[in-house]
Amino acid sequence: MEDDAAGRRRPDEEAAVRYGIEVVPFGPYAEPGPVVELARAAEAAGWDGLCIWDHCHFWGGVGDPWVTLAAVACATDRLRLVTDVSPVPRYRPHLLARSVHALDALSGGRFTFGAGLGVAEDLAPLGDHRDDRTRAAMTDEALELVVRWCNAETVDHEGEHYVATAAQVANRATQTPRVPVWIGGWSRPALRRAARWDGWITSAIDETQSVVCSPEDLAGSVTYLRAQGAREGFDVAVNGTTTAGERGLAPAYAEAGATWWFESVFGLRGSHEQMLERVSAGPPR
């Protein structure tokens, strides 16, 4: 299946599921080296992408997803790379635009920007007590700025949260018409936000392996996304777990509308050697 220049399916293509690995950057994966090892194994085993969490305050030591993805970009040729998901209000938009542009360039146009509001459990311990409404407004305003800057625009902007005067902070991105943006979040406002962009990314399970989004839940959300104007080629990415050699629930999520399945890889699931073995066994096709 071929993609357009921004990694999205063309409207005339039949939908097909792609498979990636979701890296949780704690424990052994707080360091870039083991993640690069996973990425190389994933590419060799036929996986299509790699996404990585962007949190600051979970389970002790936390890796930097942007630095790690840069290392993965330089070590792979084919994997699509995704932030899962970056809390936009935690970043200054002009610095975020430079990071998005850098990963787009390093990867040769293989980067997708996964974005969201962030969660209180992650932000509050670092002194960020802004409510969801404020962070939503900041996210919407910042995303527009990031995309404009990644299209090499000189930006004049005076908004509720950000100001820019004749500011050009990045060269034009490799991907057209823009670096694709996927939105994370469960709420109806998050889904409406996602429908304005290029995709939605969600989790089938939580860190305890409990199901938090069933195939039926996903199907309902996909119906809502379409009603909100999600265009042809819109991606729906789901994170979950399967056993090597078995497809598990992945086909049910595909039937419900998923276009990506990301296999969760993290220290609570097993050792690095066990995760390498699972990744090397290939995707649940």
Per-segment meaning from a language model:
Residues 8-27, 118-124, 160-178, 229-235:
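N-terminal small/glycine-rich loop or linker at the start of catalytic domains
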Residues 13-31, 89-156:
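Flexible, glycine-rich active-site loops centered on histidine and acidic residues
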Residues 75-78, 107, 196-201, 256-260:
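Glycine-enriched alpha-helix->loop->beta-strand junction motifs that scaffold or abut catalytic
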Residues 142-147, 213-220, 269-285:
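C-terminal helical cap(s) of enzyme catalytic domains, especially alpha/beta-barrels
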Residues 19-23, 50-52, 81-83, 111-115, ...:
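Hydrophobic faces of well-ordered beta-strands that scaffold small-molecule active sites
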Residues 46, 72, 103, 146, ...:
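Conserved, mostly hydrophobic/aromatic
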Residues 30-42, 99, 184-193, 243-253:
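Short, acidic/polar
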Residues 2-75, 136, 179, 279-282:
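N-terminal beta1-alpha1-beta2 module of alpha/beta enzyme domains
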